[in-house]
């Protein structure tokens, strides 16, 4: 539910809070997509992630008190990049509130560099990609 502190004076959700709310849902996506080895690398602090590019399109602004749900998935894979798509549904109004696309990478937190998507991870993600 959208809180008053997330909105402007007119009661509309501020743009940065759409991205914040989508980001809050990412652990759920990774829990579904990651292999045990991926999860262990993240939990140990050896690996993290970063969004390199983000595009947000607000179609019908969420308002204070709106209930929403988020649908997310992988749209494409590069050597190191994962293109993610997000749809934010305004459950109160019954319509699409916003869509977003992001390009993300897994990062080696010791070297601070993006890592290649392993063959095992690529195979798993390709099976789960949005078609």
Summary of predicted features, one role per range:
Residues 1-53, 105-131:
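Hot-dog-fold acyl-thioester-processing enzymes
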Residues 58-67, 74-131:
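HotDog/MaoC-like acyl-thioester-processing domains
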């Amino acid at each position: 539910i959208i809180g008053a502190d997330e909105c402007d004076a007119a009661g509309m959700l501020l743009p940065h809070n759409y991205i914040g709310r989508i980001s809050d849902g990412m652990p759920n996506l990774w829990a579904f997509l990651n292999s045990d080895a991926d999860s262990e690398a993240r939990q140990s602090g050896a690996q993290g992630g970063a969004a390199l590019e983000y595009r947000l399109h607000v179609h019908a602004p969420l308002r204070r008190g709106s209930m929403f749900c988020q649908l997310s998935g992988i749209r494409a894979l590069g050597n190191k990049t994962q293109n993610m798509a997000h749809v934010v549904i305004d459950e109160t109004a019954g319509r699409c509130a916003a869509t977003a696309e992001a390009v993300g990478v897994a990062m080696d937190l010791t070297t601070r560099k993006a890592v290649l998507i392993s063959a095992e991870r690529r195979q798993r993600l390709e099976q789960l990609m949005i078609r």
